[in-house]
């Protein structure tokens, strides 16, 4: 694991070329809640951070979200050139990230969507997984027993272990085939 501020991290100095990159850009400026006039999740954050039609950021908080997304995509693309067999998966709750103009720089990619409760989690949390290896996730709908906004922050951002296991098994199976 690498834990760093990706806006400052010199990824070109990494002493190896990764086979897999997983990324979770902050969701707060891409959630559908950020397109409304209220912010249910965090009262200290601005209510409406982005224009829902143009995706234009309306404040510094949204600009930071865009910069983090752009940098994440830049890092993925840098290592894709170094390793054409690189597999990536970038997750974000279903919202407006898929409408971001910056996502075009990630192409080609596919989007798999699932609910966390499909993986025995107590949260419903519909989430998109942008990837380049034909990721298949459980489909359908379910109802979680916890509202995401009422869950402690550390749990709110956690991906269910069974979902992580499923993703990495698919990456491994895909590497064997290619």
What are these regions (language model features)?
Residues 1-178:
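Conserved active-site and SAM-binding loop architecture
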């Amino acid at each position: 694991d690498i834990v760093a501020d990706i806006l400052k991290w010199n990824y070109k100095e990494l002493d190896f070329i990764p086979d897999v990159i997983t990324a979770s850009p902050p969701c707060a400026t891409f959630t559908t809640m950020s397109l409304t006039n209220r912010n249910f999740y965090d009262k200290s954050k601005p209510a409406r951070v982005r224009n829902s039609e143009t995706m234009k950021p309306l404040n510094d908080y949204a600009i930071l979200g865009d910069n983090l997304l752009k940098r994440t995509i830049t890092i993925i693309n840098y290592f894709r050139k170094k390793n054409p067999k690189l597999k990536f998966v970038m997750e974000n709750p279903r919202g407006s990230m898929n409408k971001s103009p910056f996502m075009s720089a990630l192409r080609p990619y596919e989007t798999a969507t699932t609910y966390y409760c499909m993986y025995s989690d107590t949260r419903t949390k519909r989430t998109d997984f942008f990837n380049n290896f034909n990721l298949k996730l459980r489909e359908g709908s379910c109802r979680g027993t916890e509202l995401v906004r009422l869950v402690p922050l550390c749990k709110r951002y956690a991906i269910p272990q069974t979902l992580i296991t499923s993703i990495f098994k698919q990456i491994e199976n895909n590497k064997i085939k290619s």
